[in-house]
Amino acid sequence: MFSRLLFFVALLLIPGVSRAEEAPVEKAGFAKKLTIYLAKGAPNACGAGCDRWIAIEGEIDRDAAARIRSFLLAVKDPQLPIYLHSPGGNVEQSYAIARFLRARKATARVGRTNVPACSAGTQIDAACLKIKAAKGEVEAELSTRNAMCVSACAYLFLGATVREVAPDSVLAVHNSRLMFVVHGHPPPQAVADFRRREMVSADRDRNVFLAAMGISHELSDLIRTVKFENLHVLTRPELYRFGIDTRPLPDTLWAVEKETRPYVRKIAQQKNGNGSSFRMMEWRLFCENKDRGR
């Protein structure tokens, strides 16, 4: 039998599992293990009447699912929204976490949590990760601007029952890469056949997963067209058409932009017709003096 002649160790890489294959910038600024913690912000920090949320961030490592499940089972309030900021990682772990989020009927959003108690300029050094790992709530700030959930994180995100991608955050996808180690000297055709079977299996697993999550098969078709080395940022019409975020008027919260001249900002996207296009709207408020704004 084939299995007696050859010994293959195969690893299906979905975005981010193999560090040797990543561009260095892809995971810059992210912890090497998926981190989860309770965060508490200012009143209405995560929406009207919401000041507490669950932060999940960093690379999706191969032990992430058990860790995330254990943490969430201990959270007394199942209605707390989950904010994701991750460059991806292990796809099997993403599937497992997604299925647990679905069973929990979770609300997931793409957002970046910042802990002021951490050293300025970093959120992933050992001291900061220790703060986040401590029991209880962590005082934090929340932002959707430039937050990202890409690669395998997108699968994790799809598990939530309620999914919200703010107009200034990113959900992105790309195809898988198959890597395997060959022991011995098998015929090239045997290697090619093995590769083909594994990729077919990966596509099938993805299709089954997306169908279970209620997502259009069009997303899987799109993923197959995007090379592993690239990322496709899902557009608002795609988010709507694929059934990922079907809100007719997605928007951001009002946020203070700490520029040379600070201002508060809000962005919204309004669905046109059947959702094939969205109208972008942005508001900016500046203070001209202590008594007047514009």
Report each predicted region and the residues it spans.
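N-terminal organellar transit peptides
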Residues: 18-148, 152, 162-172, 177-294
